[in-house]
Each structure stands twice: as structure tokens, then as C-alpha cells.
């Protein structure tokens, strides 16, 4: 369910008692964590228990398992994620009571109020770049508040309240959320057509980034990765309009001489350079920022090492767009060395697979062995014409090196049957495929 953002969003300390529907998700849990740190009364509900819910309880949140209208009594504001359906009993009850109901983006804007916001946007690389900028600023002596779409390995959390005036935030373009943040500065990693179920056309999608850049403070700045045509064009347009614009390129990595990053891959190098440039524009010393980049050990589900068993290394990543798939397979190839890359890919959303399924399959051709799962539906309805078979059929590898496995519980065994000592197994996708890696390790250990 997508809710409109109110024309005026109150600061978080004026929202009263806040209840999150879907509090365990990556987006809402971080906002809840920041509100709790500010002394705001927080409650929430989710369908299943998790370590995230345990952590929020320990911070003082009242968390319910399951959804019930009774959970929103004595609540002033309801915050919902896009995964919440219109018939959710808590949402229905909040509307009946006339409570303030906010989408995730408005709740994030509420906790940003009064801070100097650096918003990180782009089709790919938002989470990694936001993470890199956060650790770089911390190393340089800043203590920013941050909200990221994944858990930082160094802290184990996806958000934290800082003592400084900076707020580093991942800015999601999928539903237009990033148009409501009014940041001081922004980083744009790339612009490539995606979320066309929301935007309709590639042109409308790209135009949203222009509108986003127009929301920056007059004395703020824009950092763009010039390796990407869309981001480079955005930089040129806004430089011509008088905006302070900085461009970076992975082809000019001299600023990071002597810095060993946590993962190979040109896209990760570009992310690090963008973070460095933003930190310098904020007034911090490049050497201090680079020290932070060198200390970065990753973010959950971004080329995350899950373990090794039977001589097989297992990694997991969130990549679900063709460009992201290609980038992470490049990185996996570098990590694998002389070993082969065996990938399990779970297409994400019927709407995305319908548009990009063939391109996904072509990108997967950079692996040595490919297992394609069925489409992870999330909030969408199935379409018998759009399944994982569409992706598998487009992989440019011999048939014996590609498998479409619709039975989720059979995927781990299929990967183990294909992997050999020295190989790297990589699970890719934004859905439940992340659970496959531990199963593979368990089978290899057994």
C-alpha cells in the first residue's frame, strides 16, 4: 500500500506515541530506533519474531507479534510500510479513529527535521554508499545520525542517533519518497530505469532525480558518479544551473591510493569515491575519511560473506537489477580467483521481471553455473507468464549449466550438487533467497 506524503510533516517529537506496522522491516526498524533514542514512545507489530524485534524491545519499544486493532489504542501516529495491505486491522482501526497515518518516507522526514541531511540516492549502490559515508564521517570525527537500508557490519544496526547535526540517509526513489526530504546535500550514484510500475516510463523515472536535486539547499552540493550516463547528465544540468556539483569516476581512483576496500568491483570503488567526495565537501580531511573507508567491513546483504564449508565460500547479496547482478558477479569473480562462481538468483517482483527478466538472464551469464528460483512476489500477484523460467531461458550458457528450480526447498541441494572445492556460491536477490546460503553451508558441513 502506498500512502501520500502530507504537505507538511511534523518533527518527530510532535508525533506523540508512534506505532509502526511492520516494525521489523529494514526501513521502519531504523526509524523506530532513532525515535527510541530521542525518548519517543514507540510500539509496533510484525508477523514474525526476529533479532531486530528483540533489539527494539530491549531499547524500550512495545512490540506485538501479529496484527490486531487493539494494538493501536493509546496511539497518536501510525507509520506503515509499503508492504502493509489496506485490510490490515491496525491500519483500518487507525483510519476509523482518525489517527495521523504516515508512510515510511514521511516518518523518515520527521526524524530528519532540524538536521543537516545528506541524502544518498541512485538506482544502485545507495545502501553501500550511505554506509561508506557514515563510517568515513565517523572516522573523521563527526558523529552523524544515520539511517541505512541494511545493517552496518561494524555496528550491527541499520540506524543510530548521533550527537552531531549531520544526518546521513539512504533516499529511496522507488515510490518518490526522496522528493520529500529537502536535504542539504545529495549523492547520486547512478540513474537507470527501474520501478516503472511506479514511474511509468524511463523518462519520468530520470526526471524524478532532477526534481530531487532541485530540493537541495541553495548552499548545498551534489555529488554524482560520472561513470553512469544518467548521473553524469544530471551533474551537467545542475552545474549549468549554478549548483555546486562534484563528479567522481572509478577510472580516477588516485584519491584512494593505499586504501584497500572490503570488496573488489568497480561499482564499489565508485561508491567509495562518492562517499569520500561528499565528506570532503562537508569540510572533513580526505586522509581521515579515507581511513574510515579502509576500516569499512561491509553491510548486511551487500556482498556479505556467509561462511565457508567443504572448501566452498558462500556469499549473499541484495542485487536484483541486471546492472547490480553484473556488478556483483564481477566482484565475485575477483574474489573466487581460480574457483568458479555458482549463483542462485531469485527474481524480485513480477512487474520488474516482466520488464527486465531477459536482461537479468543475460547478466547471469557471467557466472559459471546458474540456478534461478521462482519470482519473489512481495506485494504483487503471480502471473503464470512471468516466472523464473523466463530468466533462466535467457541465460547465455549451455543448458546443463543452468537450472530453473521452482521448489525453494530444493535450491540448496542443487547448489551443493554443482559446487566444487574452491568455488564461490553467491545468492542474489531482494527476497527470501538470503536464507539459502546458511542451508548450503549446513549441507556442505554435513
Swiss-Prot record:
Pathway of action: Cell wall biogenesis; peptidoglycan biosynthesis
Catalytic activity field: UDP-N-acetyl-alpha-D-muramate + L-alanine + ATP = UDP-N-acetyl-alpha-D-muramoyl-L-alanine + ADP + phosphate + H(+)
Single Gene Ontology BP annotation: cell division
Residues that hold ATP according to the record: 122-128
GO molecular function: ATP binding; UDP-N-acetylmuramate-L-alanine ligase activity
Function: Cell wall formation.
The protein, known as: UDP-N-acetylmuramate--L-alanine ligase
Amino acid at each position: 500500500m502506498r500512502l501520500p506524503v502530507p504537505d507538511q510533516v511534523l518533527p518527530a517529537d510532535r508525533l506523540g506515541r508512534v506505532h509502526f506496522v511492520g516494525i521489523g522491516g529494514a526501513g521502519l526498524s531504523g526509524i523506530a530506533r532513532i525515535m527510541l533514542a530521542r525518548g519517543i514512545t514507540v510500539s509496533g507489530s510484525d508477523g514474525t519474531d526476529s533479532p531486530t524485534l528483540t533489539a527494539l524491545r530491549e531499547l524500550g519499544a512495545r512490540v506485538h507479534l501479529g496484527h490486531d486493532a487493539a494494538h493501536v489504542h493509546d496511539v497518536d501516529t501510525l507509520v506503515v510500510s509499503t508492504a502493509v495491505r489496506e485490510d490490515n486491522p491496525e491500519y483500518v482501526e487507525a483510519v476509523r479513529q482518525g489517527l495521523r497515518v504516515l508512510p515510511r518516507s514521511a516518518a523518515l522526514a520527521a526524524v530528519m527535521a532540524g538536521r543537516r541531511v545528506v541524502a544518498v540516492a541512485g538506482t544502485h549502490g545507495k545502501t553501500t554508499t550511505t554506509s561508506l559515508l557514515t563510517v568515513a564521517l565517523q572516522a573523521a570525527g563527526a558523529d552523524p545520525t544515520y539511517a541505512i537500508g541494511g545493517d552496518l557490519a561494524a555496528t550491527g544496526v541499520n540506524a543510530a542517533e548521533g550527537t552531531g547535526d549531520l544526518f546521513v540517509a539512504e533516499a529511496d526513489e522507488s515510490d518518490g519518497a526522496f522528493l520529500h526530504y529537502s536535504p542539504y546535500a545529495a549523492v547520486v550514484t547512478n540513474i537507470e530505469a527501474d520501478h516503472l510500475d511506479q514511474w511509468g516510463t524511463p523518462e519520468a523515472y530520470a526526471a524524478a532525480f532532477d526534481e530531487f536535486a532541485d530540493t537541495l539547499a541553495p548552499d548545498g552540493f551534489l555529488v554524482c558518479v560520472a561513470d553512469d550516463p544518467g548521473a553524469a547528465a544530471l551533474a551537467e544540468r545542475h552545474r549549468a544551473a549554478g549548483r555546486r556539483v562534484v563528479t567522481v569516476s572509478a577510472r580516477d581512483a588516485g584519491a584512494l591510493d593505499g586504501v584497500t576496500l572490503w570488496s573488489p568491483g568497480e561499482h564499489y570503488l565508485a561508491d567509495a569515491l562518492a562517499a569520500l567526495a561528499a565528506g570532503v565537501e562537508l569540510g572533513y580531511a580526505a586522509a581521515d575519511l579515507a581511513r574510515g573507508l579502509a576500516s569499512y567491513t561491509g553491510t548486511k546483504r551487500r556482498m556479505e560473506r556467509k561462511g565457508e564449508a567443504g572448501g566452498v565460500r558462500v556469499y549473499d547479496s541484495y542485487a536484483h537489477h541486471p546492472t547490480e547482478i553484473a556488478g556483483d558477479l564481477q566482484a565475485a569473480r575477483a574474489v573466487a580467483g581460480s574457483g568458479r562462481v555458482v549463483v542462485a538468483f531469485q527474481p524480485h517482483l513480477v512487474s520488474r521481471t516482466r520488464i527486465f527478466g531477459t536482461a537479468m538472464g543475460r547478466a547471469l551469464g557471467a557466472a559459471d553455473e546458474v540456478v534461478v528460483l521462482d519470482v519473489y512476489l512481495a506485494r504483487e500477484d503471480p502471473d503464470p507468464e512471468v516466472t523464473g523460467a523466463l530468466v533462466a531461458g535467457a541465460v547465455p550458457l549451455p543448458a546443463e549449466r543452468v537450472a530453473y528450480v521452482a521448489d525453494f526447498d530444493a535450491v540448496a541441494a542443487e547448489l551443493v550438487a554443482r559446487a566444487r572445492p574452491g568455488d564461490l556460491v553467491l545468492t542474489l536477490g531482494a527476497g527470501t533467497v538470503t536464507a539459502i546460503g546458511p542451508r548450503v553451508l549446513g549441507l556442505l558441513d554435513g
